[in-house]
């Protein structure tokens, strides 16, 4: 089995500069011989203050074909601080993320 690469990334500090981030990430991927990234959003909720990440704003920025919201991989402790630690909503959903990364690999595309 081939190794898959899935990158993690936090949007903190990129709220008003998301377009520049996407442009830079695409340039890096192209320089390494890859197609543009698929962005997977694992936030439980998308109600934030960061301008380009409120609701579906980031999806609108990158386009529907380059964005997936997988909130089942979100941290329940964001909504319920009494949990006190990271608690993934549906850990088994990680398998869907791996399946998606495998499909992207066939297209010479990586996942962030």
Please give the residue ranges for each predicted region:
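Residues lining hydrophobic/aromatic ligand-binding pockets adjacent to catalytic sites
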Residues: 1-112
């Amino acid at each position: 089995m081939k190794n898959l690469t899935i990158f993690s990334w936090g949007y903190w500090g990129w709220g008003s500069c998301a377009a520049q981030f996407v442009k830079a990430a695409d340039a890096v991927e192209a320089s390494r011989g890859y197609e543009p990234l698929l962005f997977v959003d694992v936030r439980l909720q998308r109600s934030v203050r960061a301008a380009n990440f409120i609701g579906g704003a980031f999806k609108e920025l990158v386009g529907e074909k380059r964005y997936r919201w997988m909130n089942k991989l979100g941290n329940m402790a964001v909504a319920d601080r009494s949990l006190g630690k990271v608690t993934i909503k549906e850990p088994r959903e990680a398998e869907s993320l791996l399946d998606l990364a495998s499909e992207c690999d066939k297209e010479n595309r990586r996942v962030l």
